[in-house]
Amino acid sequence: MPSFSLLTGHFGALKQTIDGMPPNATLHSIMLKLSQKFRSGMFYINMWPFSGTWLVVATPSGAAQIQSLNLSKPNILRRPLETITGGPSLMSMHGETWKRWRALFNPGFNPNYLIGLAPLIADEVVVFCEQLRQKARTGTVFQLEPLTLRLTVDTICSVTLDSQLHHQTQDHPLASALQRQIEWASFGTTFNPFKRYLTVRPLVMWYNNRLMNRFIDQEVDRAYREQSGRQSKSVISLALRDYMKEKDGSLEDFKRRVAPQLRVFLFAGRDTTSSTLLYAFYLLSRHPEALAKVRLEHDQVFGPYHQQVHEKIHQDAKLLNQLPYTTAVLKETLRLFPPSASMREGRPGVEITDDNGQVYPTAGCNVWTLTVALHHNSAHWAEAESFIPERWLVGSDHPLYPAKGAWRAFEFGPRSCIGQTLAMLELRVALAMTLREFDIAPAYDKWDHIYPNDAVKEFNGHRAYQAEKGGGGAHPADGMPCLVTFRV
């Protein structure tokens, strides 16, 4: 446990940790730095007056214990999450209610089912590629994140709702309302009391709720009308058909209960997939040998002409399952820059034991599996700070082979991320359709020249450190300024 003061609690230790870090670094990054002082991989920290005591866990065995205990999400996460989603969702539900809704959506997120929706994803990436072409023609530095966020919103709505928002080419009310809702939500990651308490948040969120739910209601009504005719393959249509077969299933009840689920798919999938795509571009630009291997793999699977990838995905989407090195790059990207973590509420009588046999009671604590610290824990990863996609392709007898349970980008077990297959599929499609046409290079040096300031600009050796941007997400700093050029 960090040094404790009766006057300031653990904030003295936090201040020492924060000193020398970028001012907008994520709380995850702050805790990563702090965790390096605790070799056991577990420690308590008291966040009074903003929160209670946290038990931070950064070992595979500790994370596995937490997973097996079936603990609930704490109010510090559940309340702001349900503010964004408009009610209980798969991320905040527990018990039998969670099981029912997870079972309804599992078929739509099954890998064999989703691969059939890959052409819809490819159609959205076509628009993204045209956006990149326009940027390449200008030859100017721009922030890539707004483009990737719009791509992920369009993709998620296409797959889950069979609805084309065209948000990549024009603002859509649903996406705009979601963005505002996320920006106004507070997950307790800011220590500024004015931002936390003195806001017009309730009024803004009420308005956003109305906009989002109105759109979702219209789309569910459309899906219901089309059930007797055109059979949509969207995730929501599949869930609706199964729901209406239940003895107490009604359309109005489904609409009321499903809106938070769709909003959580948008919220959770939008930021995380966008950030992972950005970091994949970033890391591949820094590691040209890995980029060359990815491009070679795409040549071998899709043929030598990048213009044909979209058509080939439409003809045989299962080609996307033949990209082991591309998948390794994405898993290594998620290891170095995981977009989220997992927090659960401790209970009396529930204890976690570290690798040395030390017991940590969880009563009165929020138990935080700090994914970024686990992924950078040198006790469980060879060359933990290095980008080595090959670690995902070696045998179990190789020194680089990942330790069991040490990679938790999507968590494990029954409550693992339901959207992980969709996210990985979208990322593979995006890389396959962009990397052989474009060179995408971070341009932080030029950005810092245009927008100079005296703040610290690096963390852990990266200018593209994970930055806070509302809603508790981890985004590449400054929206990933870059230059895009056509490959010769």
From Swiss-Prot:
Q: At which positions is heme bound? A: C417
Which UniProt key words apply to this protein? Heme, Iron, Metal-binding, Monooxygenase, Oxidoreductase
Q: What induces it?
A: The genes forming the sterigmatocystin biosynthesis cluster are co-regulated and induced on oatmeal porridge or the fungal isolates were grown either on oatmeal porridge or in YEC medium (0.2% yeast extract, 5.0% corn steep liquor). Expression is positively regulated by the cluster-specific transcription factor aflR that binds the palindromic sequence 5'-TCG(N5)CGA-3'found in the promoter.
GO biological-process terms attached to the record? positive regulation of sterigmatocystin biosynthetic process; sterigmatocystin biosynthetic process
Extract the signal peptide range.
none
Q: Which cofactor does it need?
A: heme
What protein name is recorded for this chain?
A: Cytochrome P450 monooxygenase stcS
Q: What happens when the gene is disrupted?
A: Impairs the production of sterigmatocystin and leads to the accumulation of versicolorin A.
**Upper lineage ranks?**
Eukaryota, Fungi, Dikarya, Ascomycota, Pezizomycotina
